[in-house]
Each structure stands twice: as structure tokens, then as C-alpha cells.
Curated annotation (Swiss-Prot):
Region (CTP-binding): 459-474
Record's protein name: Dolichol kinase
Disulphides: none
Enzyme class, UniProt record, top EC level: transferase
Native source species: Bos taurus (Bovine)
Membrane topology category: Multi-pass membrane protein
Keywords: Endoplasmic reticulum, Kinase, Lipid metabolism, Membrane, Transferase, Transmembrane, Transmembrane helix
Lumenal side: 1-18, 96-111, 156-163, 210-224, 276-297, 355-359, 423-436, 494-495
Pathway(s) per entry: Protein modification; protein glycosylation
Segments in the Cytoplasmic topological domain: 40-74, 133-134, 185-188, 246-254, 319-337, 381-401, 458-472, 517-538
Catalytic function, reaction form: a di-trans,poly-cis-dolichol + CTP = a di-trans,poly-cis-dolichyl phosphate + CDP + H(+)
Transmembrane regions listed in the UniProt entry: 19-39, 75-95, 112-132, 135-155, 164-184, 189-209, 225-245, 255-275, 298-318, 338-354, 360-380, 402-422, 437-457, 473-493, 496-516
Protein task: Catalyzes CTP-mediated phosphorylation of dolichol, the terminal step in de novo dolichyl monophosphate (Dol-P) biosynthesis. Dol-P is a lipid carrier essential for the synthesis of N-linked and O-linked oligosaccharides and for GPI anchors.
Length: 538
């Protein structure tokens, strides 16, 4: 979450506005840093992709200003194509490097497939923008065509036939998800956010299908499949109910009972058998044994339940204040919204230090609960639908302009993705050394500490504003300082972290991501942890 009151709309300035150029400059610093660290043909592809995305981004911005985009996108931000386009490719590159260093060829190839899939979906988004822009932007088409040609040529000679098919399958899923979800969820995403979120879901769905078809008789590691099945199951459930409630009123008791019954049927009849096929054991029994395997896990679960209770009490207290307020449009102040960031930090740090597998599973379960409650709120499912609408409306901001409220889900994703995306098979011989030891803390540092401190200090004491934004220099500087202090505390309390004198890279990574937070208009809860993860893992 950001600290500005109301970010400028795309139409409030020229396409080549200073804030957009500054955001692009920060992104190119990240891309070139990873290119210098990796320096192979795949990193050259990432540079080419960033160059063409930089030019195509302005076509998307113009389409949004003119209202000529195919779907209804969120209007309180620019398109965000450039920062979103390079995330999956860069993530794949750094995963490849880490697994190559660990001597794991399977996951080294997996990283290349991640990078290739990210480039494919990014090129599709660029082609879509160029295809609907009138008049046809000849120069931009030439640049995009040259970059795309280089990427396709290199990938053609680097990927096996099976890997090419895998990338094309993920691209096909991405195209269909774009048509379905962007139609069902108008104004929920910018083009860049749609690329990032739907690209990730498409890749996960394709991986789940692949692993379901190639599962062997031996038991699989449940942690490798639990997240895939839960995320894909919740997305498919949402598509199913969205289609169903087109033909019936979702707010009646009959529809609500049907919703709960079908949720049980889909969960017990589809999701659990699917997970059972993958892990070759009873999923519920495995989950119960996993959660209560050690005494430490029991204490952690009790502690997390206490924090969840505190979060619920904060929501109820703020709504009680609104009820007694004279203004019916009372909104929670910035500091109040940041309470949840503090609660999440207090949740994740003990989990990262004491039991990361438990945190991995608990975050997955929490994500499923958040998505399910959002379905209940969105479809007005009785008995909680209207209550959730009233309670959560207090915490809305300009980014919740669509039918879904996604900021709390993005916060959970931003904190959890560094846990989920750490290449565990490539770190089994020992923890990551140097700056890479901080990878699991990327969400805590970027969002839990950095964004929270920047928002509070920027909104209360900030006076010097960054050009073209409502973000402040004081907020950014205090954000960097707070993250440095947090790194020092992590060194004290987590004995498994050994930075190996990589302090300059850590400081540069934190500063770069803090500058990105100052200029981006995208969902920073999701974007910032991914960029910090990429830089720390490089």
C-alpha cells in the first residue's frame, strides 16, 4: 500500500511524464543489474523485452486515456506494462543461476521455462496493445518486432520441444484467462497488474496439469503441490460461481445455501481427490499431522490465532468509530490501515525464523480463506456477505475501484511470495549465503517495513515531494533507514543469516526498490517484494 492520498490519473499529464520516466529508469537499473550478474543470452532477451515494453507502455497509456482498451482497466494508474513485463523473466533468470550453482539441472531448466513463459505473455500483451492502437504505431511496431524476433530466435534454439510446448500451453491459458477474468472483473487491474497476476496463475495452472498427467507412483512432496492445487482450485471456483450467478440472484437464501453446498462438493469432490492423486496420501490427515507435528508449531499456530483476533478487533473498532462519526464517508486513516502491516510483520518474522514450511502452508491456507471470504462478500452470500461489505468498505482506497477488494490479498501475496518462490531444492545443501540469505524476508522488508514506514512518515512529516508524484523524499529516506535497521535486527535474531560482507548490494537493492515505491502507481504490495526478491537472489 502507498502513502499518497490520490495518485495522478493517466490523463493528468503528458504520456512522457516525469514520474513514468523515473519509474522506467528504476526498472532499467534492475534489469541491467541482473543482466550484469547473469550475462548470458537469456539476460540479453530480458534487456530486449524491457526496451520494447518501454515503448509499448505509452501505447497502453494512450489507450487507457482514450477509453479504447479492449477491457475496462483500473484508471487511477498508468498501464504499468514495463515493470510487470520483466518480473517473471528476471525471476526465472535468478532461479536458473541459483539452481545452476547448486548443481540442480532440473530446476535450472525450470528457471529457463519460467523466464521464457514470462517473455511470451509480456510479448502477447504488447502485441495486443499495438493491434488495437489506431493509427498503427509503425516505429513502435518495428522496435517490438525486432525485440520479439530476437527473443523467439534465442528461445527456439535454447528450449527443447517439450519446453516450447509448455510455454505455448501457458500462453494459451493466459489468453483465455485474460478474456474471462478481465470481462468478469472490470476495473480491478491495470494492464501490467493483469499481466503479472494472470501470467502467474496461467503458469501455475499449466504446471498443475503437467504434474497431474506425469505423476509417478511414488509419493510426492506435499509442499510442492499444496499451493498449486489451492490457488488453481480457488480461481476455478470463482469462475464457476461467476458464470452461475449470471443466471440467478446470488443474494437470496436459496442461492447462498447452494453456494455453500457447491463449495463443499468442489472441495471434497474435486480439490481433495486432486491433491490426493499428487501426494499419494490423505490430504486432510497429512495437513493435520503437519500442523501439529512439533510443539513449536502448536505455539506458532496459537500465536497466529491471537494476531488474527487482534486484526478482527481492529476492523470492528474502526467500524464502530465510523458508526459514531457524523460523516457517513468516514475512511480509515493511513496509520490505521498500516496496523495490518505491523500485524503481518509480527506474523511472518517468527515463522521465517522458527518454521518456514509451516509458514508456507499457513500462508496458503490463509490465501484460500481470504479468497473465499471475498467471494462471499462479492456475491453477497448469506449470512456474512452484507456484513463483510460493510466492514471492509472502511478500508477501501482508490485502487479498489472494481467489484473486488484485492488490497488485503495483495498484501498477503507480497509477504508470502518470497517464501513460496525460494527454490527449496536448490537450497537443501545449506542456506543461501550473502544477500540471498535475506530472500525469505523480501516481503517483510519491502512491504511490512519499508512501505509502512514510508507511508506513515511521508503522510505526517513529508514536505519535499518527488517530481510528478505525491510521495515524499522524507518518506523514502526513512523507508530505507528502517529497512537497514530491520536487516541488522534479522542478523541478531536469525542465526541462519550470514551476509558475507554483501552490504553494498543489500543497500543498493533496498534503495532501488524504495525508489520504485516512490514512483510506481501499480499495486506496490505485490510489485515491491518481487523486485527486492529478484535483486537479493541475483
Amino acid at each position: 500500500m502507498t502513502r499518497e492520498c490520490a495518485p495522478p490519473t493517466p490523463g493528468s499529464g503528458a504520456p512522457l511524464s516525469g514520474s513514468v520516466l523515473a519509474e522506467a529508469a528504476v526498472v532499467f537499473v534492475v534489469v541491467l543489474s541482473i543482466h550484469a550478474a547473469v550475462w548470458d543470452r537469456y539476460s540479453w532477451c530480458a534487456v530486449a523485452l524491457a526496451v520494447q515494453a518501454f515503448y509499448v507502455q505509452y501505447k497502453w497509456d494512450r489507450l487507457l486515456q482514450q477509453g479504447s482498451a479492449v477491457f475496462q482497466f483500473r484508471m487511477s494508474a498508468n498501464s504499468g506494462l514495463l515493470p510487470a513485463s520483466v518480473v517473471m523473466p528476471l525471476l526465472g533468470l535468478v532461479m536458473k543461476e541459483r539452481c545452476q550453482a547448486a548443481g540442480n539441472p532440473y530446476f535450472e531448466r525450470f528457471g529457463i521455462v519460467v523466464a521464457a513463459t514470462g517473455m511470451a505473455v509480456a510479448l502477447f500483451s504488447s502485441v495486443l496493445a499495438l493491434g488495437i492502437t489506431r493509427p498503427v504505431p509503425t516505429n513502435t511496431c518495428v522496435i517490438s518486432g525486432l525485440a520479439g524476433g530476437v527473443i523467439i530466435y534465442i528461445m527456439k534454439h535454447s528450449l527443447s520441444v517439450g519446453e516450447v510446448i509448455e510455454v505455448l500451453e501457458a500462453l494459451l491459458i493466459f489468453v483465455y484467462l485474460n478474456m474471462i477474468l478481465l470481462y468478469l472483473l472490470p476495473r480491478c487491474f491495470t494492464p501490467g497488474e493483469a499481466l503479472l497476476v494472470l501470467g502467474g496463475i496461467s503458469f501455475m495452472l499449466n504446471q498443475l496439469i503437467k504434474r497431474s498427467l506425469t505423476v509417478v507412483e511414488s509419493q510426492g512432496d506435499p509442499l510442492d503441490f499444496f499451493l498449486l492445487v489451492v490457488v488453481v482450485g480457488m480461481v476455478l471456483m470463482g469462475i464457476f460461481f461467476s458464470t452461475l450467478f449470471v443466471f440467478m440472484d446470488s443474494g437470496t437464501w436459496a442461492s447462498s445455501i447452494f453456494f455453500h453446498l457447491m463449495t463443499c462438493v468442489l472441495g471434497l469432490g474435486v480439490v481433495l481427490p486432486w491433491l490426493h492423486r499428487l501426494i499419494r496420501r490423505n490430504p486432510l490427515l497429512w495437513l493435520f499431522q503437519f500442523l501439529f507435528q512439533t510443539e513449536t508449531r502448536v505455539y506458532l499456530l496459537a500465536y497466529w490465532c491471537l494476531l488474527a483476533t487482534v486484526a478482527c478487533l481492529v476492523v470492528l473498532y474502526q467500524n464502530a468509530k465510523r458508526s459514531s462519526s457524523e460523516s457517513k464517508k468516514h475512511q480509515a486513516p493511513t496509520i490505521t490501515r498500516k496496523y495490518f502491516h505491523f500485524i503481518v510483520v509480527a506474523t511472518y518474522i517468527p515463522g521465517i525464523i522458527l518454521d518456514r514450511p509451516l509458514l508456507y502452508v499457513a500462508a496458503t491456507v490463509c490465501l484460500a480463506v481470504f479468497i473465499f471470504l471475498e467471494y462471499v462478500r462479492y456475491f453477497r452470500i448469506k449470512p456474512l456477505g452484507h456484513t463483510l461489505r460493510s466492514l471492509l468498505s472502511l478500508f477501501l482506497d482508490e485502487r479498489d475501484s472494481g467489484p473486488l477488494i484485492l488490497t488485503h490479498i495483495y498484501l498477503l501475496l507480497g509477504m508470502s511470495l518470497p517464501i513460496w518462490l525460494v527454490p527449496r531444492p536448490c537450497t537443501q545443501k545449506g542456506s543461501l549465503g550473502g544477500a540471498r540469505a535475506l530472500v525469505p524476508y523480501a516481503g517483510v522488508l519491502a512491504v511490512g517495513v519499508g512501505d509502512t514506514v514510508a507511508s506513515i512518515f511521508g503522510s505526517t512529516m513529508g514536505e519535499i515531494r518527488w517530481p510528478g508524484t505525491k510521495k515524499t523524499f522524507e518518506g523514502t529516506m526513512t523507508s530505507i533507514f528502517a529497512q537497514i535497521i530491520s536487516v541488522a535486527l534479522i542478523l541478531i535474531f536469525d542465526s541462519g543469516v550470514d551476509l558475507n560482507y554483501s552490504y553494498a548490494w543489500i543497500l543498493g537493492s533496498i534503495s532501488t526498490v524504495s525508489l520504485l515505491e516512490a514512483y510506481t502507481t501499480q499495486i506496490d504490495n505485490l510489485l515491491l517484494p518481487l523486485y527486492l526478491l529478484i535483486l537479493l537472489m541475483a
